[in-house]
């Protein structure tokens, strides 16, 4: 059956269909409201046990260990680095 597909040839030029792309709405407004909602949620809910443990490691100058812990729990290196930076900024503010 596979060989039968190889013998089929297209005898006319194939053109890409013309599709009009939809314009996206203003992103800045939605982004600002999303950041505001996240900030309010963080302020109300407080720190999770994972964040508390990471902060205790950061206070003890174990940045590497905190990053490894966060990477394991959050799923990626990029997310862990961002969370470590956020928690370090919180420590500096206090």
Curated annotation (Swiss-Prot):
Keywords: Cytoplasm, Ribonucleoprotein, Ribosomal protein. It comes from the Eukaryota. Pfam families: Ribosomal_L36e. It is found in: Cytoplasm. The gene is RPL36. InterPro entries: Ribosomal_eL36 (IPR000509), Ribosomal_eL36_sf (IPR038097). GO terms for cellular component: cytoplasm; ribonucleoprotein complex; ribosome. Component of the large ribosomal subunit. Residues 1-25 have a biased composition (Basic residues). Belongs to the eukaryotic ribosomal protein eL36 family. This is Large ribosomal subunit protein eL36. GO terms for molecular function: structural constituent of ribosome. One of its GO terms (biological process) is translation. The keyword Ribonucleoprotein applies. Residues 1-30 are annotated as: Disordered. The keyword Cytoplasm applies.
